């Protein structure tokens, strides 16, 4: 039996979908069968990041409403055969994704996949609650600014009090710039952990390769030059129970290296 992990944030624009795509791909690269589910109804992006937007004929609501089954809707990655993507609907209303039926879908998927990763909508409204309803674990993504960290803390509190099905909550600090955090110009990992107060699963450094890779329809976990890609791989390993130390972030390497 696999497990369902929701990737959430509270604040939008923190890189939640990028984390979902890269961590899911990294899990598939170590031999795990992975299903990525986009629940951001009306604003789906996971299919585009994964390069399957032209192949996505059905969506998660089609499966919950029995228009088609999971086999017919989930798109297998051409490059990573253990990885499947189930897109969100671009045209339906968020409330049309019924949480009980969505849980049934996730419970069935766990029988066939090692990991079901749910890309959760931003905010704490209906879509958030629906995505959390079937989850076994949660990863909260934040960036080192006060608004994002406050929202992440709020999300952690809601999960702890309202979703007893979620047995573990962990924090992913995304887009950290060591040069700025060490100078006190932005928050660092210690301040983020103090604010959110959940276990850390990983720190992803700011990395120009993410933009370059996305523009070329690539994933950073498949780019050997990408420090962020290495961080995503490490997060995947920790999610799978492997103890790996945090990356040592070399400021000179991050900010003076030329990217070709």
Where are these regions (language model features)?
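NTP-binding/hydrolysis catalytic cores, primarily Walker-type P-loop NTPases
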Residues: 216-260
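Walker A/P-loop NTP-binding active-site region of P-loop NTPases
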Residues: 4-69, 115
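P-loop/Walker-type NTP enzyme "switch/lid" segment
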Residues: 39-111, 212-216
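G-domain G4 guanine-recognition motif of GTPases
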Residues: 10, 143-144, 169-182, 203-210
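Beta-strand-loop-alpha "switch" segments that mediate conformational coupling across diverse proteins
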Residues: 177, 192-220, 232
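Inter-motif core of Ras-like GTPase G domains
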Residues: 111, 125-146
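Conserved C-terminal guanine-recognition region of P-loop GTPase G domains, centered on the G4
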Residues: 149-164
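Charged helix-capping and loop-helix junction motifs
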Residues: 99-103, 183-190
